[in-house]
């Protein structure tokens, strides 16, 4: 089967932003103008195509990254609409991993928000080329050039306007295209009757100034263009387009466009810019992976290369389990068998679909560069690689942040226990930042996630999709333990109870590991002091103790253990004896290594009228917060602080009452830090009291 669109004419893009920048509305308009939907859906009416889960339609926020295919100017455009709420960072993270380009949407009034910085950093992590759409230019207080300056200053981006608005706030009548050096005037409310016109005389000077800056910046990166520009002082529309595209793909240039998606202005020009400036799969670096031999290799974006794809999302739906994949190379056919190289398991491809939000189109194959979904995969989860059995490769996977908040959950009726277990399994398969575990002491089921809203929505989904009513406990902070110094540890387990005894003995050296390493085990046994078959069990004993902690029952992180010596008995030694000895040695070592308790610290940004600045700062300090920055702009104060998560429960209510309902805040995980001694002692004694 031949390709519908050559690879050069495919664009895999994401639309990313902070909450309320108008991202879902922008996606809706793109689908309307490119012919996927024939009626405009509004987020605040709860009718948007990409917001297809019931909770999204109710709350007006986008939770899951819906993948939709559309076309524009003979190009296939695959769009992923990503959530702006920080509790759903994994959705943004996983979409950035599989995209080739991003449209970052900013509100013309609010400008750069804390969540915008998070999304921008995620795009930086994966070196995703991007362009900016400054939306909501029809709103009171809209200021295009101010937002452009914020993007340069706060995001350290090489932002360059390629458009200017004609009028602003309620009088937005058109857009100046600096590349083509002309104006587009909107003649009807649907944005379908657009008149090309000369630049209005009152804006000629400003437009000429910005066009000169644009030509200068574009020419800087291209020797051929700089010569033409120095000689003639001018670049043609074609030369500018070529230079901007080069700049976006190679030099971090960020073209900035403007408009109002809600008022149907500027959206077709955004689509034109996607085609003109954002990369095709062949324009970005080939995906890297590791061969079974351990050698690094690449897979080029080419139908003739060996098949490779990354599963970036798993979803349960009425038709079965959908696994979203990004095709990197080769062709994937319906009915074929492939290899999950991450898990070393064979999978059968039952059906293949391309999505238009919650409508689907069955296809016989997916090709390099496509985004689609597979039905019928049994063992594949988020971040797994699928490839040919003859050409195995493991592609680089996703960065998955650790959950920071947990709650106990139980069904309202005993009969729902099995349903609850099914629901939790399905939800944790979909969302790798949602973890399910059982508390060994209380036997309660504990769910952990990225924030209160995240867990609230998951509990809501249990009720809607799985018909399980659940009771939820009070939120608990996910503390961690670690060590601050080095020491030796010894564990000797010897039991003699008639007949065969038990004997295991290990000596370890313990030291702090690099941050983010978790538990690191090194075997330095020489001369067979501990036989090979007992090293694995000893390591497992240590790992299990590590997971249940030593100080207060929280997982120990960033610990390096080196097995240096030990002894065994020909008859009495067993795997179980060495597992117990490993656990004993680990506990012994930790006690001598200055163990400490760590807590999740959150980056908090609070916005309120500046009359309340003193109260806001005072309140954050009383929550053990460290204020890291503050600014006042147009009577609005912004405070950035780092605050322990444990002190932030119920903050939304407190902030509302403190600021007469006019304060808003956003919060995201920053890092783990040591808990002050007096607070740690209280937590440890409380936990030991419960045990």
From Swiss-Prot:
Record InterPro entries: EFG_II (IPR041095), EFG_III (IPR009022), EFG_III/V (IPR035647), EFG_IV (IPR047872), EFG_V (IPR035649), EFG_V-like (IPR000640), EFTu-like_2 (IPR004161), G_TR_CS (IPR031157)
UniProt-annotated binding residues for GTP: 17-24, 81-85, 135-138
UniProt family annotation: Belongs to the TRAFAC class translation factor GTPase superfamily. Classic translation factor GTPase family. EF-G/EF-2 subfamily.
Function description: Catalyzes the GTP-dependent ribosomal translocation step during translation elongation. During this step, the ribosome changes from the pre-translocational (PRE) to the post-translocational (POST) state as the newly formed A-site-bound peptidyl-tRNA and P-site-bound deacylated tRNA move to the P and E sites, respectively. Catalyzes the coordinated movement of the two tRNA molecules, the mRNA and conformational changes in the ribosome.
Cellular compartment(s): Cytoplasm
Domain of life of the source: Bacteria
GO-annotated biological processes: ribosome disassembly
This protein's GO CC annotations: cytoplasm
Protein name: Elongation factor G
Sequence ranges assigned to domain tr-type G in this UniProt record: 8-282
Molecular function in Gene Ontology: GTP binding; GTPase activity; translation elongation factor activity
Keyword Cytoplasm part of the UniProt annotation: yes
Gene coding for it: fusA
Keywords: Cytoplasm, Elongation factor, GTP-binding, Nucleotide-binding, Protein biosynthesis
CDD domains: EF-G, EFG_III, EFG_mtEFG1_IV, EFG_mtEFG_C, EFG_mtEFG_II
Species whose genome carries this gene: Prochlorococcus marinus (strain AS9601)
Database matches in Pfam families: EFG_C (PF00679), EFG_III (PF14492), EFG_IV (PF03764), GTP_EFTU (PF00009), GTP_EFTU_D2 (PF03144)
């Amino acid at each position: 089967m031949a390709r519908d669109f050559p690879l050069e004419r495919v664009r895999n893009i994401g639309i990313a932003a902070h909450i309320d920048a108008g991202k879902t509305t922008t996606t809706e308009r793109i689908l309307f103008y490119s012919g996927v939907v024939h009626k405009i859906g509004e987020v605040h009416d709860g009718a948007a195509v990409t917001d297809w889960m019931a909770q999204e339609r109710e709350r007006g926020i986008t939770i899951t990254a819906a993948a939709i295919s559309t076309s524009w100017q003979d190009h296939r455009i695959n769009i992923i609409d990503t959530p702006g709420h920080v509790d759903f960072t994994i959705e943004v993270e996983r979409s950035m991993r599989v995209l080739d380009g991003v449209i970052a949407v900013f509100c013309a009034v609010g400008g750069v928000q804390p969540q915008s910085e998070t999304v921008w950093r995620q795009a930086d992590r994966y070196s995703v080329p991007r362009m900016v759409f400054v939306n909501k230019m029809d709103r009171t207080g809209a200021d295009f050039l101010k937002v452009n300056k914020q993007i340069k200053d706060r995001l350290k981006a090489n932002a360059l306007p390629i458009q200017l608005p004609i009028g602003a706030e309620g009088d937005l009548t058109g857009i100046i295209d600096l590349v083509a050096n002309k104006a587009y005037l909107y003649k009807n409310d649907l944005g379908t009757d657009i008149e090309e016109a000369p630049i209005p005389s009152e804006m000629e000077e400003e437009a000429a100034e910005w066009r000169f800056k644009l030509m200068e910046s574009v020419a800087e990166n291209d020797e051929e263009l700089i010569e033409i520009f120095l000689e003639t002082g001018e670049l043609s529309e074609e030369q500018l387009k070529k230079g901007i595209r080069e700049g976006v793909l190679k030099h971090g240039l960020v073209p900035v466009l403007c408009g109002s998606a809600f008022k149907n202005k500027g959206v077709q020009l955004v689509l034109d810019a996607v085609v003109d400036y954002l990369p095709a799969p062949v324009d970005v670096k080939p995906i890297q992976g590791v061969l079974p031999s351990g050698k690094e290799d690449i897979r080029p974006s080419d139908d003739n290369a060996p098949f490779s794809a990354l599963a970036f999302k798993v979803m349960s739906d009425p038709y079965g389990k959908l696994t979203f994949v990004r095709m990197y190379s080769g062709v994937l056919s319906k009915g074929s068998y492939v290899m999950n190289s991450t898990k070393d398991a064979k999978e059968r491809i039952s059906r293949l679909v391309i999505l238009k939000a919650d409508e689907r189109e069955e296809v016989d194959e997916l090709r390099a560069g496509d985004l689609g979904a597979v039905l019928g995969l049994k063992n594949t989860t988020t971040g797994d690689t699928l490839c040919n059995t003859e050409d195995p490769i493991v592609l680089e996977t996703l960065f998955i942040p650790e959950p920071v908040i947990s709650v106990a959950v139980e069904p309202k009726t005993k009969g729902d226990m099995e349903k609850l277990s099914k629901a939790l399994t399905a939800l944790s398969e979909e969302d790798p930042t949602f973890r399910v575990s059982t508390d060994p002491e209380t036997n309660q089921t504990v769910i952990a996630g990225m924030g209160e809203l995240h867990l609230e929505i998951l509990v809501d989904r249990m009720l809607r999709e799985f018909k399980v009513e659940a009771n939820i406990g009070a939120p608990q902070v996910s503390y961690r333990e670690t060590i601050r110094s080095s020491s030796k540890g010894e564990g000797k387990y010897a039991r003699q109870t008639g007949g065969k005894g038990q004997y295991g003995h290990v000596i370890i050296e313990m030291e702090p590991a690099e941050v983010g390493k978790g538990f690191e085990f090194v075997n330095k046994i020489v001369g067979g002091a501990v036989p090979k078959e007992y090293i694995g069990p000893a390591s497992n004993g240590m790992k299990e103790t590590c997971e249940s902690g030593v100080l207060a029952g929280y997982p120990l992180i960033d610990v390096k253990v080196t097995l240096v010596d030990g002894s065994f008995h020909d008859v009495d030694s067993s795997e179980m004896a060495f597992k117990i000895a490993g656990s004993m040695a680990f506990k012994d070592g930790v006690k001598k290594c200055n163990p400490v308790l760590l807590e999740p610290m959150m980056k908090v940004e609070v916005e309120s009228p500046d009359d309340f600045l003193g109260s806001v700062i005072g309140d954050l300090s009383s929550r053990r917060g460290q204020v890291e920055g503050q600014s006042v702009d147009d009577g609005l104060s912004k405070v950035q602080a780092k605050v322990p998560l444990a002190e932030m429960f119920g903050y939304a209510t407190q902030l509302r009452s403190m600021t007469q309902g006019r304060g808003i805040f956003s919060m995201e995980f920053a890092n783990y830090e040591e808990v002050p001694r007096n607070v740690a002692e209280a937590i440890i004694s409380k936990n030991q009291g419960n045990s």
